[in-house]
């Protein structure tokens, strides 16, 4: 019984590795063909410099509009109206404000601004 399980497992491993090798071979063939034709498969993303134009308190549409490492585009509700503006202060408490500025800086860093 154990021998049967070992044989079946080894056949499955051999089958999977053979299929993976075949898939890898076809990918290499496609890549070599594209290189011969002069087309590479490399895709490069480049982040352009941020074009921040808004200071804290001005209207904004996204985090990329606001200048400052911890300045984000947040919203304020006035009645039923929602206004978006650049803001960096998160709390009146000094400790909570420092933590909030750190969180804002991380969130601002994660907003990739591609233009």
Swiss-Prot record:
Disulfide bonds join 52-67, 60-73, 64-113, 66-86. Keywords: Disulfide bond, Ion channel impairing toxin, Knottin, Secreted, Signal, Toxin. GO terms for cellular component: extracellular region. The keyword Cell membrane does not apply. It is found in: Secreted. Residues 1-18 form the signal peptide. Residues 19-51 form a propeptide. One of its GO terms (molecular function) is toxin activity. It comes from the Eukaryota. Expressed by the venom gland. Belongs to the neurotoxin 03 (Tx2) family. 02 subfamily. Probable ion channel inhibitor. The presence of a 'disulfide through disulfide knot' structurally defines this protein as a knottin. This is U31-theraphotoxin-Cg1a. It comes from Chilobrachys guangxiensis.
